[in-house]
């Protein structure tokens, strides 16, 4: 299910890249070049050079970009549904390379070095594509229909979860995001160019928050840090995973305006859906963790079978996790 979901998001990416706007030079100036502004030279210079290089033939180049994303999505969906681990590995490896190039040459490192806000997508949706892909990488299988994801629930997954949410909270403490009215301005800007009902929703939210001081973004930063720490250290992990999903949906609606996909100029759904996917990956990892390391929804649990050597519960949980990861 998780691999199919990741593939579906890639397919949406590809479909959005086929929008008419993406075949014009406005895509080059308003998306590629704009994303590089304010970044260090190692981001700015190659991005500007690439933009000028592809601008004369942007229609051809954009068709290639969109096709790559569709192929990645199709490879993930087909590989997951037909239980083809080798196809999944090849597709995921290609997606990692593509994601790095997009993050560097098209997203300006997701605004990580320019005061970008995690409420509008920083540190970049493609970072989450890579994280999800690594966690769902199929390990050695013992049968044709088995495609385990050994990294789910492991220390690397928990460490990555903590690092992402802690860094997101740190970004919110940057001066640009601590200015008076910063949160209100971010929401109002997200609603610009959106259809009437979305614009009205975001305009109302922005008006409600107008004039708020840095306490609002500081509070969100603390929530992000708490989510990262709690899940990483098994403190009511499921409760905090639910909280992360609620926050991700809020970010997607109010900070990202559904990734601007309703404007005809959105290149991807942005980070909101991928944060939800990451949370579901972590949830699946909890379901498949060894019994002695499991935690209940109310706190750390104790499994007597861990002392007696019984493995039936672990095997059943691992089978459930494997099915969910497909």
Enumerate the language-model features and the residues they cover.
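Extended, low-polarity transmembrane helix blocks
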Residues: 1-326
């Amino acid at each position: 299910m998780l691999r199919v979901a990741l593939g579906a998001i890639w397919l949406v990416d590809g479909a959005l890249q086929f929008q008419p706007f993406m075949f014009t030079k406005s895509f080059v100036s308003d998306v590629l070049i704009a994303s590089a502004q304010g970044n260090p030279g190692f981001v700015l210079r190659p991005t500007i050079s690439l933009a000028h290089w592809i601008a004369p033939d942007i229609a051809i180049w954009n068709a290639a970009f969109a096709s790559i994303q569709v192929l990645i999505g199709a490879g993930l969906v087909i590989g997951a549904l037909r239980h083809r681990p080798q196809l999944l590995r090849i597709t995921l490896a290609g997606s990692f390379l593509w994601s790095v190039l997009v993050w560097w040459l098209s997203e300006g490192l997701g605004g990580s070095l320019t005061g970008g806000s995690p409420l509008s997508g920083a540190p970049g949706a493609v970072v989450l594509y890579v994280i999800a892909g690594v966690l769902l990488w199929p390990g050695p299988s013992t049968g044709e229909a088995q495609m385990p994801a050994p990294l789910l629930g492991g220390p690397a997954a928990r460490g990555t979860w903590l690092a992402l949410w802690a860094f997101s909270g740190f970004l919110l403490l940057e001066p640009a995001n601590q200015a008076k009215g910063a949160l209100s301005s971010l929401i109002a800007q997200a609603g610009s160019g959106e259809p009437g009902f979305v614009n009205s929703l975001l305009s109302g939210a922005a008006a409600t928050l107008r004039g708020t001081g840095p306490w609002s973004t500081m509070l969100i930063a603390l929530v992000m840090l708490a989510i990262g720490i709690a899940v990483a250290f098994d403190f009511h992990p499921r409760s905090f995973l639910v909280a992360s999903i609620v926050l991700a949906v809020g970010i997607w609606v109010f900070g990202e305006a559904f990734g601007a996909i309703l404007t005809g100029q959105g290149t991807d759904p942005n980070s909101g859906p991928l944060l939800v996917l990451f949370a579901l990956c972590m949830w699946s990892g909890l379901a498949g963790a060894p019994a002695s390391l499991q935690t209940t929804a109310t706190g750390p649990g104790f499994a007597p079978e861990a002392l007696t050597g019984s493995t039936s519960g672990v095997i059943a949980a691992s089978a459930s996790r494997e099915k969910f990861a497909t």
